[in-house]
UniProtKB/Swiss-Prot annotation:
Coiled coil: none annotated. This is Major outer membrane protein P44. GO terms for molecular function: porin activity. It comes from the Bacteria. It comes from Mannheimia haemolytica.
Amino acid sequence: TTVYDAEGSKVDFDGSLRIIV
């Protein structure tokens, strides 16, 4: 799942709940 944080940076959430910014 890809979302964007408040600053517009892409944040990818994988199945292990790690966050890749």
